[in-house]
């Protein structure tokens, strides 16, 4: 776990609980897609970057769930990299109390403010209009925003009726 794996000419991934994409901008500069779930993930990612003589220029967050932005704060302090995402995800990244508040429907009680639901705040520096050259944003809604629950829909999963709420992509 936490090993760098090459999958294309300029593309890699770091094997970890929330796999991290890595794209080479040139021989030394890279961007990563998401940053893992906490400071320790950030530390391990930073170690891999140093071992490969990579300079982190960007973190591109796919969304603001804590397991995708938890390493942002550590990596941004260490590397002064830029952090970019959509405008709304940037707000959740800058003000992580929004994540458990959104989940709970109000100000969260203490047990909802753990590292699994609330990452350390980091400072987004731009939005997806500022993607590095060679990268393109393709919206694939459905994992967080752009999804809604429908309690009146039932599917058959593996031939067995599945009566629980299903997420529909808008």
Task: Give a label for each model feature.
Residues 38-40, 64-69, 90-93, 163-166:
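Active-site environment of divalent metal-dependent phosphoester hydrolases
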Residues 6, 13, 85, 139, ...:
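Structural signal for conserved beta-strand scaffold positions within catalytic alpha/beta enzyme cores
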Residues 40-86, 129:
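Active-site metal-binding motif and surrounding structural segment of the metallo-beta-lactamase
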Residues 33-36, 57-63, 84-87, 146-147, ...:
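Active-site neighborhood of phospho(di)ester-bond hydrolases with catalytic His/Asp-centered motifs
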Residues 91-153:
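Metallo-beta-lactamase
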Residues 18-19, 65, 89, 151-152:
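A generic "binding-loop/recognition-motif" signal
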Residues 8, 27, 51, 78, ...:
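Short, well-ordered coil/turn elements that cap or connect secondary structure elements
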Residues 2-52, 154-170:
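Conserved beta-strand hairpin/beta-sheet module of binuclear metal-dependent hydrolase folds
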């Amino acid at each position: 776990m936490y090993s760098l794996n090459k999958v294309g000419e300029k593309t890699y991934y770091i094997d970890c609980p929330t796999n991290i994409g890595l794209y080479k901008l040139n021989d030394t500069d890279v961007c990563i897609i998401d940053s893992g779930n906490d400071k320790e993930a950030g530390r391990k990612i930073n170690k891999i970057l140093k071992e490969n003589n990579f300079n982190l220029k960007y973190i591109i967050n796919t969304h603001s769930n804590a397991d995708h932005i938890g390493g942002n704060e550590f990596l941004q302090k260490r590397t002064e990299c830029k952090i970019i995402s959509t405008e709304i995800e940037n707000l959740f990244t800058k003000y992580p109390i929004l994540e458990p508040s959104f989940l709970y429907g109000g100000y969260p009680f203490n047990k909802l403010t753990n590292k699994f639901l609330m990452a350390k705040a980091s400072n987004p520096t731009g939005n997806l209009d500022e993607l590095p050259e060679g990268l393109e944003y393709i919206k694939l809604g459905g994992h967080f925003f752009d999804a809604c629950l429908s309690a009146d829909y039932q599917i058959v999963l593996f031939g067995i009726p599945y009566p629980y709420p299903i997420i529909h992509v808008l």
